[in-house]
């Protein structure tokens, strides 16, 4: 029997939690972060569930673990952990990790104001604005993002037929726009969205296959993005992103915003240089932009960037005690 100790810095990005594991992360094998992610999931997923699930975490918890980069053009490597698994990429997690990492001396960029992270989804370039010891804004240039499929239909109990577009922005997202059985996220409670989302996700995954054309290790639809009209005057759209089993992202969701920008660009509604301000379910904002056109295999894609802010809320020392019957956490469904 042993007690495993993890040093953590807690914070949030535009309202959504980030738990940065600053000490206690396991040594991982692999030539790149995708391979290290696979090793973590095989041997150490109990760390993720122990730190993210109750009683040490909660339904919305997400976090990250820092590692030395596996490639010479990056300053630091990041493994993203959350209630739904180890994401290839996490936008709000990146903003929070960079903010708290720099403010607490865990990350030292080679060039002030900019750095690159080595994520399982690939290299992510970042700029940040620092005033004194505080990082006030982080902008990440995300991985190539693209519209994967249009007009996919699935039946959802209690809602009826729902038609979605699926786009990739670091994870696969089903984007639910206004239609016969869903007019606007504002017409529904968060509880209703949480109830419908896993049914819609399961139906889509059962009916269709979602595989990244260049990275077959990245597969499966993981997130549902419900959309609506903005309530903030500077925003172009509002969204509520469902992930895990019961979570609605409190931030506008970085990879979700990337996927949304890719979808709109593919439909001719955004072009290179255009900005897209995305509002979350609680009114916080991410500032997105189409940075460049790109290709992913034979698919047209874009390079999106996302800007947002984060704040540190505390420092934790967390124990996972092998004697604890809930050492690896639990989820109440």
Swiss-Prot record:
Q: What class of enzyme is it?
A: isomerase
Coiled-coil region(s): none
A GO MF term? 4-hydroxyproline epimerase activity
Keyword Cytoplasm belongs to the record: no
Q: Where is the signal peptide?
A: none
InterPro entries per the record?
Pro_racemase_fam
List the catalysed reactions: trans-4-hydroxy-L-proline = cis-4-hydroxy-D-proline
The protein's job, in short, is: Likely catalyzes the epimerization of trans-4-hydroxy-L-proline (t4LHyp) to cis-4-hydroxy-D-proline (c4DHyp). May be involved in the degradation pathway that converts t4LHyp to alpha-ketoglutarate, which would allow R.meliloti to grow on t4LHyp as a sole carbon source.
Q: What is this protein called?
A: Probable 4-hydroxyproline 2-epimerase
Q: Which organism is it from?
A: Rhizobium meliloti (strain 1021) (Ensifer meliloti)
């Amino acid at each position: 029997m042993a007690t495993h100790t993890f040093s953590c810095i807690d914070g949030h990005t535009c309202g959504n939690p980030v738990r940065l594991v600053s000490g206690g992360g396991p040594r991982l094998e692999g030539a790149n972060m995708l391979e290290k992610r696979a090793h973590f999931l095989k041997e150490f997923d109990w760390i993720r569930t122990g730190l993210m699930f109750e009683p040490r975490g909660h339904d919305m918890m997400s976090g990250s673990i820092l590692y030395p980069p596996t490639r010479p053009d990056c300053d630091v490597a990041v493994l993203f952990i959350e209630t739904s698994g180890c994401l290839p990429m996490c936008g709000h997690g990146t903003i929070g990790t960079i903010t708290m990492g720099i403010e607490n001396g865990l990350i030292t960029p080679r060039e002030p104001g900019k750095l690159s992270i080595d994520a399982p989804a690939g290299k992510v370039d970042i700029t940040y604005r620092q005033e004194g010891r505080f990082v006030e804004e982080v902008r990440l240039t995300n991985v190539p993002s693209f519209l994967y499929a249009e007009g996919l239909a699935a039946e959802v109990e209690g809602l009826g037929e729902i038609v979605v577009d699926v786009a990739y922005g670091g994870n696969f997202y089903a984007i639910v726009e206004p239609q016969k059985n869903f007019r606007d996220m504002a017409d529904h409670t968060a509880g209703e969205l949480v109830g419908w989302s896993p049914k819609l996700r399961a139906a889509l995954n059962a009916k269709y296959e979602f595989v990244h054309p260049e990275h077959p290790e990245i597969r499966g639809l993981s997130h549902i993005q419900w959309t609506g009209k903005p309530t903030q005057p500077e925003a172009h759209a509002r969204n509520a992103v469902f992930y895990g089993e019961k979570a609605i992202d409190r931030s506008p969701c970085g990879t979700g915003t990337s996927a949304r920008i890719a979808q709109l660009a593919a439909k001719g509604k955004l072009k290179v240089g255009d900005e897209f301000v995305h509002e979350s379910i609680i009114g916080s904002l991410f500032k997105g932009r189409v940075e460049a056109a790109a290709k992913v295999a034979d698919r047209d894609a874009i390079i999106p960037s996302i800007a947002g802010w984060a704040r540190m809320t505390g420092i934790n020392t967390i124990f996972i005690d092998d004697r604890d019957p809930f050492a690896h956490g639990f989820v109440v469904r």
